[in-house]
């Protein structure tokens, strides 16, 4: 068993002796009976050197959106009335209703005992004061259009078919818990 973080020079190839995984750097392939890809569908597809038509058709039907997360202490992004603050606070831009933002009030959500309120805001539509920013993180989330939702039922068709197993939040609603749930389900297929 080997656990590896995805690198830019990583690929998986099928061979007569099983799966070969190239980790880059020293031009060396490692041989495995099975490989688990616990990552986004698009990243999993990019890691497979020569995906089957079925793998390509299924994994390419999941889209992802870039997101900006800002960890901060700026209360000005929250509603003026503190009585309506909740763990999850959703905001919509009045001028452009397709723009929305979500702020997690981490003190309530994570039961933090800090003196200061701490927030995690995704894709802010209001400016967050620079001096109150703790960290900025860019990442991607699954984007659920009808194509992705319809395609979720097909994921079982590629599970362990080429000795490659898949898990990730795209098996569910995009939450961390969905990634965990999909890994538990994936393990049931490990010895098929």
Feature names for model-found ranges:
Residues 1-12:
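Single conserved hydrophobic/aromatic residue that forms the stacking wall/gate
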Residues 2, 61-62, 155-157:
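Short secondary-structure boundary/capping segments
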Residues 5, 29-30, 159:
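A short, aliphatic-rich alpha-helical micro-motif
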Residues 13-142:
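Mid-domain catalytic core of redox enzymes
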Residues 99-192:
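Conserved flavin/dinucleotide-binding core of flavoenzymes
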